[in-house]
Amino acid sequence: MTLEAFADTIIPGVKRFPGDRAIAGVCDDAGSVEAGALELLADPATGVAPALVPLSQMLNGHATAYAEGAGLTLDDDVPPFVALGYDDRATLIAELTAPGNPERDGWVLLCMFSTMAFDTAAHRSTAEAIADGHPGLIQMGFAEPNSDGLWRFPDYGYGRELAKRHPNTTESGSPE
């Protein structure tokens, strides 16, 4: 729940159900959590999976200290970071990712992977993510692949052909 609240602070989303505490619900569209931030963070390829429990515990410790410093009373029904309101979550994350914070690298990694889950669906096949309606790719207007699952763009990105096709290029786009 703590890492969901963290990811939701980076790219906020709509609450999944009325009593959803992890998702602050500060926007009307799906955010990082619905886009798969937790799946990406837990993927062994990221290298952060073994650190997720310690980072979550540290984040809750920082949330408790932040709340005490701000004179806030936290609800004991949820983890301390989840109990913070969105603005307080964002302020705390800004402090944790500030230059000079000795823990900065860990928090920046969580921010990056939360963003990547939304912006790129890095934990999924892009074609499958689009077919499944991945919220980040859809919101950004990412083009659907052709019927064979490949992307081809008949119009050049800069309005002109940048280079002639190499004579040894195969139909799949690979050199011979």
Protein language model features and the residues they cover:
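Flexible, low-complexity segments enriched for small/polar residues
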Residues: 1-3, 7-124
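Long, amphipathic alpha-helical surface segments
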Residues: 100-176
